[in-house]
From Swiss-Prot:
<dbReference type="InterPro" id="IPR011009">
    <property type="entry name" value="Kinase-like_dom_sf"/>
</dbReference>
<dbReference type="InterPro" id="IPR017441">
    <property type="entry name" value="Protein_kinase_ATP_BS"/>
</dbReference>
<feature type="compositionally biased region" description="Basic and acidic residues">
    <location>
        <begin position="344"/>
        <end position="360"/>
    </location>
</feature>
<feature type="domain" description="Protein kinase">
    <location>
        <begin position="4"/>
        <end position="260"/>
    </location>
</feature>
<keyword id="KW-0723">Serine/threonine-protein kinase</keyword>
<dbReference type="GO" id="GO:0006970">
    <property type="term" value="P:response to osmotic stress"/>
</dbReference>
<dbReference type="GO" id="GO:0009536">
    <property type="term" value="C:plastid"/>
</dbReference>
<dbReference type="InterPro" id="IPR008271">
    <property type="entry name" value="Ser/Thr_kinase_AS"/>
</dbReference>
<dbReference type="GO" id="GO:0003729">
    <property type="term" value="F:mRNA binding"/>
</dbReference>
<dbReference type="GO" id="GO:0004674">
    <property type="term" value="F:protein serine/threonine kinase activity"/>
</dbReference>
<dbReference type="GO" id="GO:0016301">
    <property type="term" value="F:kinase activity"/>
</dbReference>
<protein>
    <recommendedName>
        <fullName>Serine/threonine-protein kinase SRK2H</fullName>
        <ecNumber>2.7.11.1</ecNumber>
    </recommendedName>
</protein>
<feature type="compositionally biased region" description="Acidic residues">
    <location>
        <begin position="313"/>
        <end position="343"/>
    </location>
</feature>
<feature type="active site" description="Proton acceptor">
    <location>
        <position position="123"/>
    </location>
</feature>
<keyword id="KW-0547">Nucleotide-binding</keyword>
<keyword id="KW-0808">Transferase</keyword>
<dbReference type="Pfam" id="PF00069">
    <property type="entry name" value="Pkinase"/>
</dbReference>
Amino acid sequence: MDKYEVVKDLGAGNFGVARLLRHKETKELVAMKYIERGRKIDENVAREIINHRSLRHPNIIRFKEVILTPTHLAIVMEYASGGELFERICNAGRFSEAEARYFFQQLICGVDYCHSLQICHRDLKLENTLLDGSPAPLLKICDFGYSKSSLLHSRPKSTVGTPAYIAPEVLSRREYDGKHADVWSCGVTLYVMLVGGYPFEDPDDPRNFRKTIQRIMAVQYKIPDYVHISQECRHLLSRIFVTNSAKRITLKEIKKHPWYLKNLPKELTEPAQAAYYKRETPSFSLQSVEDIMKIVGEARNPAPSSNAVKGFDDDEEDVEDEVEEEEEEEEEEEEEEEEEEDEYEKHVKEAHSCQEPPKA
């Protein structure tokens, strides 16, 4: 930690809080995610790190290294100064079809690259897509905590992801192909960019999980009259939002769809993308998998109750103190959200018991 200095707080994510730091020698800005040592360091964290390390693509946040502090595991990664794509949509209300396509093209290229390495993200959403600071922003996929590699693990069965983005087969609690589920989530992302709302939520009752789940299972959505989009775009959405995942459009087919191909930037064409698929492409990280797993293994040991930040300078002590404060706030928020999550689980079970997903 001696080589970094704190710049500012970046907020909280699925597993911990994040901060912006600057490398003291190179002056490079990095994002650092802090995860409390002990019980929070589970297989999801290890999977996120190992999967993330293997990814080398311009539309994916770069993994740099992991660092062990007396109280936390710190994951160091590329900093995307443009913030979340979610914020950009909130500020704009919704995007033009051309702007939505520009970001969708990048999202598809990033997800397709992940799938080529047998890594499914499983929690694709606007909040997990960041932007760099350039005038024509590069989209960067982040947060691989729920991702699952089919090379290392069985097909996913758990219900993970944000309710609004979840595919019907994920709700079924049977084994499903994570690649098909990612395509569905990409479709939800495209819809939100175009419309400024979620496709399967009742705008008058957005927290009604039962209704959202029923609409997902029935593929019940519509494009509002005030949103003017091309027939090609409507066709693509109709091919993505298909209940039977085996009949859903694939990433390979999306990349050949006329709407996707329109104004496709040169760097996103198949010949340009081919360079990233070469297996000999080295990792961005200088840390070996063995070194990372050793550090993660040590992080599973809880922080000592005394002298937790012994040997740290004042800046680092401040970071640890602030991280602890934010985590306390997070725990309070989690307790408040538990009832809603229980309600969500209850409605998922109800949906299973009362209906089978309709055939598409």
